[in-house]
């Protein structure tokens, strides 16, 4: 199971996903402090800062660079914190 976290803050949903055995592959968080936390605990994930241009195409390109096209074969869970 793949997790993508929107409005991720300091990674609460990503931590819960880890506890569930899911892999967080991408996050989107605009706050610089939250970005530092996410980069520290999920260094291999793609981290984006602006939800306005966080599109499927962007995710596909960035995740394919990191994980190859096989990431598309898993089920995807998208979570969203409150902005």
Regions found by a protein language model. Name each.
Residues 1-83:
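Conserved active-site and SAM-binding loop architecture
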